[in-house]
A protein has these predicted regions:
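Outer-membrane pore/translocation modules
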Residues: 1-101, 141-145, 198
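Outer membrane beta-barrel transmembrane domains
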Residues: 94-212
């Protein structure tokens, strides 16, 4: 909705390739419970995009995102909490001559490990646009958008061999969106598959050993 007028209406399903997001990350931690990360990520508009569609997988323009993250883990209780916050600067969409404003985003999750392999929890996100859209293709004025989502998450660690070496981690999240303004609202489902590469890329809970 904008100015009391519905800009888009209806439902649409879209399939295709996503954009490419190269990222540089820096991690550090106290090797126990507190873990930190800073990142810079670019957005390359290679995904499926059509300016006439209501739903698109690609965003149709380049972008650069900077931010950081914090994760707390407790190996005794199997609780984990994490949050990632960032700010994104969007570049001009050359198809529509429309430039989205600078936006902010927060993603968070709290989970409980039921076993070494299985964890369940709740996750959510908030998207809030800080500056209005611009460009010669902007026909709706000082447009700013927002949305939030919240829902369940499930994680499972696949292991191999008698030593139960962690090999693959699957995380599935489902979000019910609300608070939407100048943005589509619905239900979003994400599945992330992490493959082992090296020794320490997959975090697992292991019981702490007492020192005598």
């Amino acid at each position: 909705m904008y100015g009391g007028t519905s800009v888009f209406q209806g439902n649409q399903t879209t399939h295709g390739m996503s954009d490419i997001y190269p990222v540089a990350q820096l991690y550090w931690s106290d090797r126990d419970r507190n873990h930190f990360m800073a990142y810079v990520m670019g957005g390359l508009p290679q995904g499926t995009y059509n300016s006439n569609n209501l739903a698109n997988i690609g965003i149709g323009h380049g972008a650069i995102d900077v931010g950081g993250a914090y994760t707390y883990t407790n190996r005794k209780t199997y609780w984990e909490a994490s949050a990632t916050a960032g700010v994104t600067n969007n570049f001009m969409n050359n198809v529509t001559q429309y430039k989205s404003g600078v936006d902010s985003h927060l993603d968070w999750a709290i989970s409980k490990g039921l076993s070494r392999e299985l964890s369940v929890g709740i996750a959510g996100y908030v998207y809030y646009q800080l500056t209005a859209d611009t460009g010669s293709g902007n026909t709706v004025g000082a447009n700013k958008s927002r949305v939030l989502g919240i829902g369940p998450e499930v994680g499972y660690l696949f292991t191999r061999g008698d030593a139960q070496m962690p090999m693959t981690y699957l995380n599935v999240r489902a979000y019910k969106e609300s608070w939407a303004q100048n943005r589509v609202q619905g239900t979003a489902v994400f599945a992330v598959l992490t493959l082992r590469w090296g020794q320490n890329n997959i975090h697992t809970f292991t019981p702490e050993k007492s020192v005598k």
